[in-house]
Amino acid sequence: MSEERHEDHHRDVENKLNLNGKDDINGNTSISIEVPDGGYGWFILLAFILYNFSTWGANSGYAIYLAHYLENNTFAGGSKLDYASIGGLAFSCGLFFAPVITWLYHIFSIQFIIGLGILFQGAALLLAAFSVTLWEIYLTQGVLIGFGLAFIFIPSVTLIPLWFRNKRSLASGIGTAGSGLGGIVFNLGMQSILQKRGVKWALIAQCIICTSLSTIALMLTRTTHQGLRQHKRSYKFELLDYDVLSNFAVWLLFGFVSFAMLGYVVLLYSLSDFTVSLGYTSKQGSYVSCMVSVGSLLGRPIVGHIADKYGSLTVGMILHLVMAILCWAMWIPCKNLATAIAFGLLVGSIMGTIWPTIASIVTRIVGLQKLPGTFGSTWIFMAAFALVAPIIGLELRSTDTNGNDYYRTAIFVGFAYFGVSLCQWLLRGFIIARDEIAVREAYSADQNELHLNVKLSHMSKCLFRYKQLPRRV
C-alpha cells in the first residue's frame, strides 16, 4: 500500500485499514487485512445484491399483503393493528438478537449462519401459505420471517468491507439497490399472483424465488481468508461496551437510526393503502409501492457515490431534510394517482439513504475495533422502532376527513426525517471537532477515538463548518 494513501487526509475512514500492524494508542495491535478491491469481490457484490433482493426487497412486498388483509378481512378476528404488528415483527424481531447473531457467525462461519437464515425464511413463507388462523400468521409471516431476514442480512452486510476498500459506499449502494429491484418484482409480481390465484400461491411463489436466489448467493459467498482469520482472533463478544455506550456521538447515532426507522417503515408500509384510500384499486396501490422500489434501485448507487465524494453525514443530513420537506409539501396535499406515483419515485430514491451509508458512519464514529459490538447495539435500536412503526402509521390514519386520510401520518413521517437530519447535523459537528483533535495529536483515522474529549463549545463552532475540514465527514 503506497505511503500516499496513508497520508491522504481526505480518505474516508471506510477506505482506511491500517496495514502496518502497528500498535494503536491503547496498546492494541491493529489488524492487518488485505482487501482485494475487486477480483472475486464482484461476485461477492452480486451475492450481496441477491441477499438484499430476497430479504429487504421481499419484505417491502408485505405492503401488498397488508392492503389485501385489511381490505378482505382474511383472518377471523384480525384487526389493522394485528396486521401492522405482523409487518413490524417481520421487519425487526430478528434484529433484536443482532449481537447474538454476530457472535454466532464469528464462532461458526458467515456461510453457515446465512444458510440457517435461508431455511428460516423458506420455512416461514411455506408455512404462511398454509396458515388459516391469525396466530399462525403471527408466527410465520411475522416472527420466523424476521429471524430469516436477520440471519441473512446481518452477516452479509460484513462482506463488502472484506472485498472493497475504494468506493465502499458506492459498492454498498449498488448492493442495497437489490432491495429496490426486489421491491419491484414482489410488489408487481405478487400482486398479480394474489389477484389471480390468492394469497396461498403468492406466498409459495415468493418462497421459491427467495430460497432459490439466496441459495445461489450463498454458493457465491466467500470471505477473504486472512481477513476472516484475523477478525475471529480479535473479536470479543461484548453485549454492553461502556466505552461505546458512554460516548455522546454513539447516542446521536442511536437517535438518527431510530428516527430513520420510524420514517422509513411507516412510509414503506403506508403508500399502498394510502393510494387505495384515495379511491384507487389495490393494483394501482401496488404501482405506487413499486415506484418506491424503482427510486431506491436508481437512487442508492447514486447516493453511495455522492457520499464517497462529499461524506456520508453531510449527504445524509441534506437528503433527510429533503425527505421531510417532500412529506409535508407533497404527501399532505396529494389527491390523485399521478402525484402519488411521482411522490413514491422521489422519496424512494432517498428514503433509504441510511442503508448505503450506515456502515461508513458507524465505522467513522467508533473505529474498526469497536465496529461489531456497536453494530449489534445499533440493530437493536433499529429493531425496536421498526417494530412499532407500522402500528403508529395505521393508528395515525384518519377516516373522518375530506381528502387525505393519511395527513397525520405524513406530518409524523416528515418530523421523523427532520429528526434524522437534526441528529446527523449534530453528529457531524461532533465528528469534525473530534477530527481536529485527532489530526492535531497525529492519530490515524481508523483507530478508536472514543476516548477523545470534545467540548460542547468546540462542537458548536463546528456545526456550520463546510470547508477546510480535517477529514471528509
UniProtKB/Swiss-Prot annotation:
Glycans are attached at residue 72. It comes from the Eukaryota. GO terms for molecular function: symporter activity; transmembrane transporter activity. The chain crosses the membrane at residues 38-58, 84-105, 112-135, 142-163, 170-186, 201-220, 244-268, 287-304, 313-332, 343-362, 371-394, 409-433. Pfam families: MFS_1 (PF07690). Keywords: Glycoprotein, Membrane, Symport, Transmembrane, Transmembrane helix, Transport. It is a multi-pass membrane protein. Residues 59-83, 136-141, 187-200, 269-286, 333-342, 395-408 are extracellular. It is found in: Membrane. Belongs to the major facilitator superfamily. Monocarboxylate porter (TC 2.A.1.13) family. This is Probable transporter MCH2. The gene is MCH2.
